[in-house]
């Protein structure tokens, strides 16, 4: 109720029912929630894929779970062709719509990619934002595969 400046639960639910307002809720405040950066998520994925984050069995389990991502409308949408494996995880809270993934083209080294966004609205489905996440991932992975990007 504090986040919506409401005095009753009914007032809070009424305020949150409007997707025209992007509330500044405590869930968006890094001091009160788990928070990370796209760079750190890419480092974590690189450590996982190289076997430096977990035990061998833990690594295989984590990779298998990420390969079974059930939402194909974000990063996966940037790679609609066969011969490409995308293992990822979405993260959505209100206006925050993120996804991290490892994209692997057959015969090539895997590429970690993280796309973090903040939408203007908190609608549960925002196809244009999801498609943009896929497009940004495609552009980033294409550049990394070209060998022209220097860290």
State each model region's role:
Residues 1-25, 35-42:
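Active-site-adjacent helix/loop patches that line small-molecule binding or acyl-intermediate pockets
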Residues 26, 30-151:
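Structured C-terminal helix/loop/strand segments within mature extracytoplasmic catalytic/sensor domains
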């Amino acid at each position: 109720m504090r986040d919506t400046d409401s005095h009753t639960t009914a007032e809070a639910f009424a305020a949150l029912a409007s997707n025209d307002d992007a509330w500044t809720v405590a869930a968006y405040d890094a001091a009160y929630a788990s928070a990370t950066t796209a760079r750190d998520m890419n480092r974590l994925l690189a450590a996982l894929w190289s076997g430096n984050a977990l035990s061998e069995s833990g690594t295989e389990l984590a990779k298998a779970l990420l390969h079974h991502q059930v939402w194909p409308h974000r990063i996966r949408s940037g790679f609609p062709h066969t011969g490409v494996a995308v293992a990822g995880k979405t993260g959505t809270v209100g206006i925050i719509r993120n996804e991290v993934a490892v994209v692997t083209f057959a015969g090539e080294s895997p590429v970690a990619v993280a796309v973090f966004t903040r939408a203007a609205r908190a609608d549960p489905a925002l196809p244009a934002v999801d498609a943009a996440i896929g497009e940004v991932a495609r552009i980033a992975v294409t550049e990394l595969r070209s060998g022209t990007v220097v860290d």
